[in-house]
């Protein structure tokens, strides 16, 4: 269960969380928080429904295998398989195409951002840093197997949570809560939906989670609820702190305020958080 929670947290929380306030500043802390919670609830229901479909197909497959004298199969029932069983061949093609395109775009963004963080620290050019990041993590996943990837993901997730807690703690210390923009322009909240929706998505992991937990719906539900609740809490905390630091001005970077007060320690903290977030998302 811990592995599933770490997988969801690591995949959901990316370096983009630190820029969340740019889209929520106009709405204010409370309207933005309400929007975050509403979208999280919708996506949670969606994830639980996907899990039900996946496990139902898994059981159908196992029943068919038992009739032919074979046991349980550990092969993951993918989103494409789910689409094929529920929407037909056209649905499978559409889902496979969209997922492949999304994966390519997201991985490219992760590698590019990782190179941006690593290149100055290692005194390398961006292409070399990008290659090192890809080979190091990709090689570990490819040759180390599932257990090694799981151990690495859990380690990076703990580092992610620790660095994030330090960032929020620093922001809380330097923030002037009397100037907090609690209720800005509630009418602006709908404009934040696309960004928040994209930030909270983790549904491509559902087939892997169902297979990893052998179709145990109780554990699957627990893993999804706990794993998605942690990023929600992180987003709510950082959004409140960031909007308080920025005074509701989307052009003000709260990280710059923290960096000015903390100096070089802030740069190390931000780099550590960014690399941990990118590493877990990549895995």
What are these regions (language model features)?
Residues 44-60, 72-124, 270-283:
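Hydrophobic transmembrane alpha-helices that form the core helical bundles
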Residues 35, 42-47, 230-238:
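Alpha-helical transmembrane segments of multipass membrane proteins
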Residues 26-30, 55-63, 73, 86-90, ...:
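Juxtamembrane helix-boundary/capping and inter-helix hinge elements in multi-pass membrane proteins
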Residues 1-8, 87-102, 183-194, 261-279:
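Select transmembrane alpha-helical segments in multipass membrane proteins
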Residues 2-19, 106, 134, 198-202, ...:
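The first (N-terminal) embedded transmembrane alpha-helix
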Residues 69-89, 231-279:
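TM-loop-TM module centered on a large, flexible mid-protein loop between adjacent transmembrane helices
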Residues 124-257:
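Helix-loop-helix junctions that connect adjacent transmembrane segments
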Residues 1-27, 43-48, 59-67, 74-76:
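Membrane-interface "cap" regions at the ends of multi-pass membrane proteins
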């Amino acid at each position: 269960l811990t592995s599933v929670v770490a997988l969801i947290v690591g995949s959901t929380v990316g370096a983009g969380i630190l820029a969340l306030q740019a889209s929520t500043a106009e709405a204010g802390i409370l309207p933005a928080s309400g929007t975050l919670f509403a979208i999280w609830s919708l996506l949670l229901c969606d994830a639980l429904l996907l899990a039900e479909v996946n496990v139902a197909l898994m059981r159908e497959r196992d029943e068919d295998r038992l009739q032919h004298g074979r046991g349980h199969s550990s092969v993951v029932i993918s989103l494409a398989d789910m689409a094929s069983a529920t929407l037909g061949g056209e649905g499978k093609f559409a889902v496979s195409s969209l997922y492949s395109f999304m994966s390519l775009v997201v991985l490219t963004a992760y590698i590019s951002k990782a190179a941006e963080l690593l290149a100055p620290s290692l005194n390398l050019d961006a292409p070399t840093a990008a290659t090192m990041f890809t080979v190091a993590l990709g090689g570990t996943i490819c040759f180390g197997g599932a257990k090694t990837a799981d151990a690495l993901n859990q380690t990076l997730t703990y580092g992610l949570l620790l660095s994030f807690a330090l960032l929020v703690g620093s922001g809380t210390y330097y923030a002037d809560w009397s100037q907090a923009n609690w209720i800005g322009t509630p009418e602006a909240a709908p404009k934040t939906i696309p960004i928040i929706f994209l930030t909270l998505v983790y549904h491509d992991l559902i087939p892997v989670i169902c297979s990893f937990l052998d179709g145990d719906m109780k554990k699957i539900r627990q893993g999804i609820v706990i794993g998605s609740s942690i990023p929600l809490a992180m987003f709510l905390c950082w959004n409140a702190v960031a909007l308080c630091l920025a005074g509701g001005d989307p052009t003000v970077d709260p990280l710059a305020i923290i960096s000015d007060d903390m100096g070089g320690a802030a740069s190390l903290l931000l780099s550590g958080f960014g690399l941990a977030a990118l590493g877990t998302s990549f895995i």
